[in-house]
């Protein structure tokens, strides 16, 4: 069981809502460079690579001094892309999936998720969550909710508000899209039986949960700024200016 940790940033050029998103400029740098830079501030990784099926992204990453791997364009999910990269680097015992469209990724969040995974090597994977703010609507299906037990193990992920506010006001936690996998579990992930939870919720992590795997949840106090649309990009640019990054 290797203690080496590999960070992987999947980046696709094709996007229905925002084509070419990884190369969208934030100031003078493309988004993927910001994501790579902030992820590289983490103390957790022994190696950090971008996984992309597009040579334009690949060349940009190499151009700013990052490491990139060209992957098959035919992967049905991001996890499949991560698996291909993990096969290329067989000496890493923990594989971390970092979203390429989160240019403001906090190193402390990465370290929290990875720290939880290294503490519990018997847990198949770990992820993160953050409490909902008063401005957020738990009924928004694009904000995935997670409930977890007193030991920090996920019970369920849903696009619906969970738990229900039947008697009193429930406390909601929003799932954050970062995962740390135990290598052996990741490499056998596609052998897991299909999950009806996964199908109806359209949430890939439910396949692992329904098949009895343990998903640890690191509770963060703040969320990363994600980019799903050009409007989101403008929000990130404004926040980066406030932080003095631009």
Curated annotation (Swiss-Prot):
Name of the gene this protein is made from: kdsB
Function: Activates KDO (a required 8-carbon sugar) for incorporation into bacterial lipopolysaccharide in Gram-negative bacteria.
Alphabetical UniProt keywords: Cytoplasm, Lipopolysaccharide biosynthesis, Nucleotidyltransferase, Transferase
Reactions mediated catalytically: 3-deoxy-alpha-D-manno-oct-2-ulosonate + CTP = CMP-3-deoxy-beta-D-manno-octulosonate + diphosphate
Pathway named in the protein's UniProt entry: Nucleotide-sugar biosynthesis; CMP-3-deoxy-D-manno-octulosonate biosynthesis; CMP-3-deoxy-D-manno-octulosonate from 3-deoxy-D-manno-octulosonate and CTP: step 1/1; Bacterial outer membrane biogenesis; lipopolysaccharide biosynthesis
Predominant subcellular localization, coarse grouping: cytoplasm
GO biological process: CMP-keto-3-deoxy-D-manno-octulosonic acid biosynthetic process; lipopolysaccharide biosynthetic process
EC numbers: 2.7.7.38
HAMAP family xrefs: KdsB
Class of enzymatic activity (EC top level): transferase
Family recorded in the similarity comment: Belongs to the KdsB family.
UniProt xrefs under CDD domains: CMP-KDO-Synthetase
MF GO annotations: 3-deoxy-manno-octulosonate cytidylyltransferase activity
UniProt protein name: 3-deoxy-manno-octulosonate cytidylyltransferase
Signal sequence region: none
Gene Ontology CC: cytosol
Cellular compartments annotated: Cytoplasm
NCBIfam families recorded: kdsB, PRK05450.1-3, PRK05450.1-5
């Amino acid at each position: 069981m290797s203690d080496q940790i590999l960070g992987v940033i999947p980046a696709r050029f094709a996007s229905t809502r925002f084509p070419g998103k990884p190369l969208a400029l934030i100031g003078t740098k493309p988004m993927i460079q910001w994501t790579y830079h902030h992820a590289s501030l983490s103390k957790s990784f022994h190696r950090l690579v971008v996984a992309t099926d597009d040579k334009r992204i690949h060349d940009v990453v190499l151009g700013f001094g990052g490491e990139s791997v060209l992957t098959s364009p035919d992967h049905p999910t991001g996890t499949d892309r991560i698996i291909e990269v993990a096969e290329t680097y067989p000496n890493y015992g923990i594989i971390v999936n970092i979203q390429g469209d989160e240019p403001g990724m906090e190193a402390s969040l990465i370290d929290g998720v990875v720290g939880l995974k290294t503490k519990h090597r018997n847990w198949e994977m770990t992820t993160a969550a953050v409490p909902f703010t008063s401005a957020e609507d738990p009924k928004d299906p694009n904000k995935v909710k997670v409930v977890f037990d007193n030991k920090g193990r996920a019970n369920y992920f849903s696009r619906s508000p969970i738990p229900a506010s039947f008697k009193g006001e429930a406390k909601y936690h929003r799932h954050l899209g970062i995962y740390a996998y135990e290598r052996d579990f990741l490499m056998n992930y596609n052998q897991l039986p299909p999950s009806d939870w996964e199908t109806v919720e359209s949430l890939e992590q439910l396949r692992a949960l329904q098949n009895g795997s343990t998903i640890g949840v690191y509770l963060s106090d703040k969320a990363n700024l994600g980019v799903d649309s050009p409007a989101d990009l403008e929000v990130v640019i404004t926040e980066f200016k406030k932080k003095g990054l631009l």
